[in-house]
């Protein structure tokens, strides 16, 4: 049962009996007031409690069951014998019908001991000086029997059932919120792979937020709900693998760029494509006007300042790193070879290459 339906039933069960009680009080006050006003008519018995002046503008008279009522015909008649009364069933009312229940006196219709069946429309007809009619509606409040008690019992039963349902719903909601809060606290204390599983379990337990939630509960759970949503968002972002794979790929590319691992086949092709340098292209001329250094050795030779500059031919060759390593290996191998003593004098005038002396000048 929805909350607004329960509240509507509760309000109806309280307001309707109160309305009937207030209506009964107002009716009793009206009866006592109109009984005093009707004392001027001496022809009416003292048992009449209502007069014709009690009808309202819409010509409706309300009477309790078991009381007496008097209805006045507001039409002008030359003789009172010309006034005739009829009920809603079309029966003409006079003193002889029903053992004197309806009494017609002048232009008044007196009904004694009103019953619930007497309700309806009462019409008076006037034949002189002109033909006219006037109607009054009589409403009777049913008081005999156990209807009021039955109605009160039904209202109390409905109110009790509604109250029990509301209390049960509030208790279930409170228990559910306590369990959810406990699960959220356990989620914050959980680390590792179990955190995602806890998140899914808590997401299943969170109820749909409706207007039935009170403001106090919303304030209490607002902070933890926001924190939980933030953790869920972080977990959702960490689940997809493509960003992680892209980061690993970028890391591997950076590592290869730092190491510079070259393919040997590509290295040989680049060596073949490199143009050879000739002797003339590898000679660089030092500017004769270049000044001497400021070293102490240079300053000590004062006579060399007046000497003219000389041209020095220098041949430069560019070698790759692999070629340099091979040259270093060959130089280390040649250092282990010791030349014979008999040609020690010629060592200064010979070029040693590949284990033999070339261009020796003796």
From Swiss-Prot:
Annotated InterPro entries: Ig-like_dom, Ig-like_dom_sf, Ig-like_fold, Ig_sub, Ig_sub2, Immunoglobulin_dom
Membrane topology (Extracellular): 19-147
Residue positions the entry lists as glycosylated: 36, 41, 110
Segments passing through the bilayer: 148-170
Entry keyword set: Cell membrane, Disulfide bond, Glycoprotein, Immunoglobulin domain, Membrane, Signal, Transmembrane, Transmembrane helix
Assigned GO CC terms: extracellular region; plasma membrane
Cytoplasmic side, ranges: 171-362
Signal peptide residue numbers: 1-18
Chain segments carrying region Disordered: 285-306, 323-350
Subcellular location: Cell membrane
Post-translational modification: Glycosylated.
Disulfide pairings: 73-124
Protein name: Microfibril-associated glycoprotein 3
């Amino acid at each position: 049962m929805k909350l607004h339906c329960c509240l509507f039933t509760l309000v109806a069960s309280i307001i309707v009996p109160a309305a009937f009680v207030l209506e009964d009080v107002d009716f009793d006050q009206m009866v006592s007031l109109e009984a005093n006003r009707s004392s001027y008519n001496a022809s009416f018995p003292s048992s009449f409690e209502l007069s014709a002046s009690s009808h309202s503008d819409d010509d409706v008279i309300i009477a309790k069951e078991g009381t007496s009522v008097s209805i006045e015909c507001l039409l002008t008649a030359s003789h009172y014998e010309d006034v005739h009364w009829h009920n809603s069933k079309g029966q003409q009312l006079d003193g002889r019908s029903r053992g004197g229940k309806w009494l017609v006196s002048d232009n008044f219709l007196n009904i004694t001991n009103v019953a619930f069946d007497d309700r309806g429309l009462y019409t008076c007809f006037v034949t002189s000086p002109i033909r006219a009619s006037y109607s009054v509606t009589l409403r009777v409040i049913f008081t005999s029997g156990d209807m009021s008690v039955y109605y009160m019992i039904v209202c109390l039963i409905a109110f009790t059932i509604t109250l029990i349902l509301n209390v049960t719903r509030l208790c279930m909601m409170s228990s559910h919120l306590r369990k959810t809060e406990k699960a959220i606290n356990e989620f914050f204390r959980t680390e590792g792979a179990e955190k995602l599983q806890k998140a899914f379990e808590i997401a299943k337990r969170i109820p749909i937020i409706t207007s039935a939630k009170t403001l106090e509960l919303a304030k209490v759970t607002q902070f933890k709900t926001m924190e939980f949503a933030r953790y869920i968002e972080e977990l959702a972002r960490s689940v997809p693998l493509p960003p992680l794979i892209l980061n690993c790929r970028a890391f591997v590319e950076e590592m290869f760029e730092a190491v510079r691992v070259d393919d040997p086949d590509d290295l040989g092709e680049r060596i073949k494509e490199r143009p050879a340098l000739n002797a003339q292209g590898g000679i660089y001329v030092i500017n004769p006007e270049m000044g001497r250094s400021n070293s102490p050795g240079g300053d000590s030779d004062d006579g060399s300042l007046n000497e003219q500059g000389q041209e020095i031919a220098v041949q430069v060759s560019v070698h790759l790193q692999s070629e340099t390593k091979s040259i270093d290996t060959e130089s280390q191998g040649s250092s282990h070879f010791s030349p014979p003593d008999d040609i020690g004098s010629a060592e200064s005038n010979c070029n040693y290459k590949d284990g033999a002396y070339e261009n020796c000048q003796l």
